[in-house]
Amino acid sequence: MTELKNDRFLRALQGQPVDVTPVWMMRQAGRYLPEYRATRARAGDFMGLCTNPQLACEVTLQPLQRYPLDAAILFSDILTVPDAMGLGLYFETGEGPKFRNPVRTAAQVEALPVVNAENELTYVLDAVKTIRHELNGAVPLIGFSGSPWTLMTYMVEGGSSKDFRRSKAMLYSEPEVARLLLDKLVASVTDYLNAQIRAGAQAVQIFDSWGGALAHDAYLEFSLKPMQQIVNGLIREHQGRQVPVILFTKGGGQWLEAMAETGVTALGLDWTTDIGNARERVGGKVALQGNMDPSVLYASTSAIRDEVGRILASYGHGSGHVFNLGHGITPEVDPVHAGAFINAVHELSAGYHQ
């Protein structure tokens, strides 16, 4: 495999010295970029983009052609796993993802297959291989999956939800059915992430978008515990390199200490947690990734720069910080403002690494 030209993202995750704080953005390949919108139009629809390895590669690389980012992230969707389980994923304009065959009964859960990514998600693995080839060692490639709880919410609700009523009802009224569903998702996600690592992903992130919707103990039982099982089963070294694992629970600030005990390399933070406080709480056990509010990108470039400076100062000196947004970049952001954010991270962070 090609030697990495820029490995500061991987180095920061391992707490090794870096020259500047590395930066990438969740959803960096997305609708805020005109070139992404053009490629998506060629693909016909979102799933047409996800399932075409050449086009998925094209949009993965677009932000790197525009900005000096320190990592690429595979262009895909967390719902590829339930789609491969037979739920029939489709997208309705203005309404987001939907499933034709939601899972709501014990019989439906029992009938669900465990995903074999090599057989059922070859288009994702082909995209990983294509992207790695095209990157040619420029920066590392991040693979990802949704967390079992987050995937379960979409599968049970049949799409997005504001209150997760059906999913939570299953947790509390039929916990054994919920556990069986989560167990199948643990096996599927573990297989999927390991397949991405074998295909060339140099780090992986577990997106737990809806863990923060759970009660304190319910999070530990139904979200963190399944993620712990995945972490235990992941390939952690491949082709002579450590494979870092990042765990990101949106709204997960109250559980940082428990998350840091899972054996992951890093925790993603949303914008509601102070990163300096988080650093004190995890005590060097894990690196931290985050955590600017994506809405700051609507402000002036000088205000963006000020907020970047504030977060860097809060984290303080030394490695172990990967700068990112606290959630995905939103479609209406001016690409110039995204560039100002990335440049500010590199320019303002150098003094923290001397």
From Swiss-Prot:
It is an enzyme of class 4 (lyase). Keywords: Cytoplasm, Decarboxylase, Lyase, Porphyrin biosynthesis. The keyword rRNA-binding does not apply. InterPro entries: UROD/MetE-like_sf, Uroporphyrinogen_deCO2ase_HemE, Uroporphyrinogen_deCOase. Its EC number is 4.1.1.37. The record marks 77 as: Transition state stabilizer. One of its GO terms (biological process) is protoporphyrinogen IX biosynthetic process from glutamate. SUPFAM superfamilies: UROD/MetE-like. Pathway: Porphyrin-containing compound metabolism; protoporphyrin-IX biosynthesis; coproporphyrinogen-III from 5-aminolevulinate: step 4/4. It catalyses: uroporphyrinogen III + 4 H(+) = coproporphyrinogen III + 4 CO2. Substrate binds at residues 27-31, 77, 154, 209, 327. CDD domains: URO-D (cd00717). The keyword Lyase applies. GO terms for cellular component: cytosol. Its main location: cytoplasm. It is found in: Cytoplasm. GO terms for molecular function: uroporphyrinogen decarboxylase activity. Belongs to the uroporphyrinogen decarboxylase family. Catalyzes the decarboxylation of four acetate groups of uroporphyrinogen-III to yield coproporphyrinogen-III. HAMAP family: URO_D. Homodimer. This is Uroporphyrinogen decarboxylase. It comes from Teredinibacter turnerae (strain ATCC 39867 / T7901). The gene is hemE.
